[in-house]
Amino acid sequence: MEYYMCGDSPSILANFMWSNNGEYNWSTKQLSLDYFKNKDNNWENKFHIWKLDWTKEYMRIYIDDELVNEININNIKGNKFKKKYYILLNLAIGRKGLRPNDNALPLVYEIEYVKVYQN
């Protein structure tokens, strides 16, 4: 899940990315911030539930229980998503190796909770 300026439009990207022998593959769903603000004008000032359901067949990304992207992992060469992984929560600032604008700092990245379920 990423926040990007896509042209002049602030957007949320729900991405899956994998590599096969150096060939990078993406499944991206781009939703403008206006899409969410049209549902709730105060949307960007609230906490939201981001969810990843990862089964033997699919990976699905949800925002506030709305499905925003999914892939069938059985269709991916090498079964990259059938290995063990770890969770990484970070605030990546900058883009393509560029230094972030110091005038935008400091920033706050608040996470209320993390839940992990495993079958």
Set out the residue ranges of the language-model regions:
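GH16 jelly-roll
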Residues: 1-119
